[in-house]
A protein has these predicted regions:
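Sec-dependent bacterial lipoprotein signal peptides
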Residues: 1-18
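Phosphate-group recognition and catalysis centered on beta-loop-alpha active-site segments
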Residues: 20-291
Length: 291
């Protein structure tokens, strides 16, 4: 029986290998992380799609991040015309399958095309169902929901589309009792953050991050999700220890190559998470450092 299980496990790993790119990641990129029980404080940007040949914001890329035992997988969300929430990265700043999501239903958007692997454009409910299945998500990976600021030709479309997407996502998360599995990322500036922060955190009891680099006192109960250049680059106003020492949880994104990974890893024990396009590559570096 043990031999059969080993064969089945080998086949499963082989299937994953066939679907992943050979670039940018170490040779053993598809092996489970750690000793088989741990979770790494690594967040896979849009499921780590740049590392694995799977569509971004897909169920398939979500499962890739789960397999690696990431802390979370990030995805983008938009509100539809029938008051549902799609998981999708808007094309040209505001389109999903060539349609404006706020003026079309889920059915209409799905009818316009599938993802590259044949999956329908997923809803937030689809993602949460995967996370809530203990067989599919045995280590409790979370979902980081990026509330997209929709833009057209470089100009922001009505910010209420983004605010309402955040609130509708909160309602769905609460209805599905998934508050412990979901956290929000709010883009830079105050147009969305100032409106949603307190309601999301206090009323819906869902964690929330702000992506503006500012004084630690300005985050309130939110955590800081900041780009590498903002706190590790030259001539920065604040460094990582300014947030850590002030008790503001900190996650860092745009950590995608050897230089940035090697600079951030020494802070790993004190960070909320490291956000990357190459989660397996980062995890292998963490393992090499004894984490």
């Amino acid at each position: 029986m043990r031999s059969v299980k080993k064969i089945l496990w080998s086949c499963a790993v082989l299937a994953v290998v066939c679907g992943c790119t050979k670039l940018e990641t170490p040779p053993n990129k598809n092996q489970p992380s750690g000793d088989g029980t741990g979770v790494y404080k690594v967040v896979a940007h849009r499921g780590g799609y740049q590392e694995c040949a799977r569509p971004d914001c897909s169920i398939s890329s979500l499962k890739y991040a789960i397999m690696l035992r990431c802390f979370a997988s990030e995805c983008d969300i938009v509100l539809t015309g029938d008051n549902d929430v799609l998981v999708a990265h808007p094309q040209s700043g505001y389109l999903v399958n060539g349609l404006e999501p706020f003026d079309h239903t889920v059915a209409e958007i799905r009818a316009a095309g599938t993802l590259a692997n044949g999956e329908p454009v997923p809803t937030l409910r689809d993602f949460i169902r995967v996370l809530q299945d203990p067989e599919l998500n045995p280590h409790g990976m979370r979902l980081w929901l990026d509330v997209k600021r929709l833009t057209k030709n470089g100009e922001e479309i009505d910010v209420n589309h983004s605010i309402n997407a955040c609130y509708r996502a909160c309602e769905i998360i609460k209805e599905m009792k998934a508050q412990s599995l979901c956290e929000f990322l709010i883009p830079t500036g105050g147009s969305i953050f100032d409106v949603v922060r307190d309601k999301v955190i206090d009323e819906y009891r869902i964690n929330l991050a702000w992506m503006t680099c500012t004084h630690p006192d300005n985050y309130g109960k939110a955590w800081a999700q900041l780009s590498y250049d903002k706190i590790f680059g030259d001539n920065t106003a604040y460094g990582p220890m300014d947030y850590i020492s002030a008790g503001v949880p900190l996650s860092v994104y745009n950590v995608d190559d050897d230089e940035t990974m090697d600079a951030v890893i020494p802070y790993y024990p004190k960070l909320k998470a490291i956000f990357t396009n190459y989660p397996s590559k980062l995890i292998q570096k963490l393992r090499a450092q004894g984490y």
